[in-house]
Amino acid sequence: MDFVQPDSIKNIHKLSIAPMMDCTDKHFRMIMRKISSEALLYTEMIVAQSLVYTNKKENFLDFNNEEHPISIQFGGDDPLILKDAARMAQDWGYDEINFNVGCPSPRVCSGNFGASLMKDPEKVAKCIEALKNNCKLPVTIKHRIGVDDDDSFSNLNNFVRHIANAGADRFTVHARKAILKGLNPKQNRTIPPLNYDIVKKLKKSNPELLI
């Protein structure tokens, strides 16, 4: 497969404000936009099912025009729901969709999304395809370098190839594995130490991908 990057993301954003639960709401994002006119802003993670079934979609989707460029981050595991969420994101005017398979929260993982989804590359690929096939926005993914004992480079590389073949436009890699048993989300942000070498190896093995 030839990987052709959309014009809208050929110029990689060198600065972004990461999606953070209970933090990156539209008020926080406006403050960040005052600091930088170039940074790519992210929403908090939005559970796709909650968005699709609510009658108050504006509570999830509203943002200020000054926030562009802005990426909406979805969590979920159902391609049928994600395709509807993708259409809504495009209709609402977002610049990009980001799919979260990096969150280690027990609440998130109990819903079979977030970091736990990395154990099922084929399902993640189907989710990416659903997003890509139902909008014209760039679709990117945030993931870890592994989950629990499933942290070999070969498994990571296989995961990325699956997702690349599904059409993902960019990979944002949190350079530590997620430990879903025994650590809380706060600990998962600092334990184990970051492993930038494996991310460098991943990029070297996939030079055609935006990583």
Residue ranges and their predicted role:
Residues 1-211:
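Flavin-dependent oxidoreductase catalytic cores
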